[in-house]
Amino acid sequence: SNIHSACEHAISLLLTTARQIPAADATLRQHTWKRSEFTGVEIFGKTIGIVGFGHIGQLFAQRLAAFETTIIAYDPYANRARAAQLGVELVTDLSELMSRADFVTIHLPKTPETVGMFNAELLAKAKKGQIIINAARGGLVNEQALADAIRSGHIRGAGFDVFTTEPCTDSPLFDLPEVVVTPHLGASTAEAQDRAGTDVAA
């Protein structure tokens, strides 16, 4: 019922992180014009890595194709025919996806296998300048390890809607202007709420 909302929120985080919109917005609201400080990156022509190729991952691929991107995905259980139909290259190794993708978006369930999957070791394999989006589940990414990778300049930025502990009012990511954060708003649209109500009533 909320797959469209969740997908659109992940795309919103990707776009706002790529163009540093919240940080730019904040400086202008402080009545300072700092145009030269905010040089973003384009999505056009880039490689997008989708981790978890279920309903939302597939929808994300479908939407991002409009930006003329190359899309790769990692999911051991992926529907190969659907991937081919969407023009998505499936990779068998998550490390390969991390080393090739300019943007990584996570669409995994939270399971014993996926908790902490994005640790310091995996993040070290990321392509330099990568942006990571997590609008799936909290706890899949080690937030401290990601904050360290961003501070070192290896990872450019991140967009996060979910956190290891929720409600979350303190994370190593909150101190970084390169990170865009929202309080688990993936399903928070009028339409998703309406559909959820209809589903319950049915």
List each model region and its residues:
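Glycine-rich Rossmann-fold phosphate-binding loop(s) that bind the pyrophosphate
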Residues: F53-G54
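Short, structured coil segments at secondary-structure junctions
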Residues: F67, L86-G87, D175-P177
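C-terminal helix-to-coil terminal segments
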Residues: S1-H9, T39, G157, V162-A202
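Phosphate-binding beta-alpha-beta segment of Rossmann-like dinucleotide-binding domains, i.e.
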Residues: S1-T47, L59-Q62, A66
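Short beta-strand "acidic-cap" motif of Rossmann-like dinucleotide-binding folds
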Residues: I71-A73
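Rossmann-like adenosine-cofactor binding region
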Residues: P76-P172, S188
